[in-house]
């Protein structure tokens, strides 16, 4: 039986990641000390802040990793808190040595696919589609984030059952994680159901901070849940993340489709790309296998066809999500149907759209788009 060494313990800890940052504890300077006394091991770790919500997860994972070493005896994990200087160094390291926060997704070399999920009107399931696509892609092994840009009507934390508040490392915000998805919302910063009463400049600043001050890490996909319509936030997103592509959500009825066209036609001014249209609340599948078009039919294809003409580029209908009460039930429970019932008609349809988005990313990942909007 080989003796336990400090090097072996450190190697074991290098396989443990900080769940918020997604990097090894050893790389983040979070291992304060390792003491080996025969087969017994004492490890002291640095936490980024006092009261770190991930403390039990970090210490538990560290203990489990060390206990896998052959011949190890008792393993004790204790914690300390980083100093202000250590937090500043960590922040600088995570930002690549850049002092001031920048928006990583605005970098032309960014390989993160950014989708702004939009609708012409409220109540069409835009937020539900956002979170379901996000968790579906996370379940496929991708690194995914959701930015709730619907400041007035924020709903993402509830749809993902996220009650954990973000933590801060110096002036960098660590987003909560739910269902494998990093998320940030103004709902994390207001008490209860308090309203947010802001004018346009404040909305712009909030979106800018969520993009720049939050540590998103190396995401494959970022979904931005926009408010309905074509107001200040839609313009801010076009200015701040020129490469963001639009996903338009509508329902089958003509009235909703006509309004959805307006949401997509903003790209004529911003020179963004419409990645596709999602038709929600399509035909309901009845117990006998027949279908019922509760809200009519054809709205999604109508929007896709019309936007193809307006933009001069093919805008596909990515999919039709059947009207399914369980989609609402799982949304209320914070357990999106895409992962709680992936084989259901709605869950399967969402999964197919997620697969199309993956294929699109693999074919044109990282290609920058132009922007014709004047920065404020």
Residue ranges of model-derived segments:
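N-proximal, solvent-exposed amphipathic alpha-helical segments enriched in charged/polar residues
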Residues: 1-32
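Short edge beta-strands and adjacent turn/loop segments
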Residues: 20-46, 321
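Extreme N-terminal, non-catalytic leader segments
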Residues: 27-30, 48, 56-118, 361, ...
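Short, hydrophobic beta-strand segments
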Residues: 41-49, 115-117, 245-246
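Conserved catalytic-core segment of NTP-binding enzymes
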Residues: 90, 205, 213-216, 220-329
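Walker A/P-loop phosphate-binding motif and the immediately C-terminal alpha-helix
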Residues: 113-151, 264, 277
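Phosphate-binding loop that captures ATP/GTP phosphates
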Residues: 137-200, 204-212
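C-terminal boundary of histidine-terminating zinc-finger modules
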Residues: 333-344
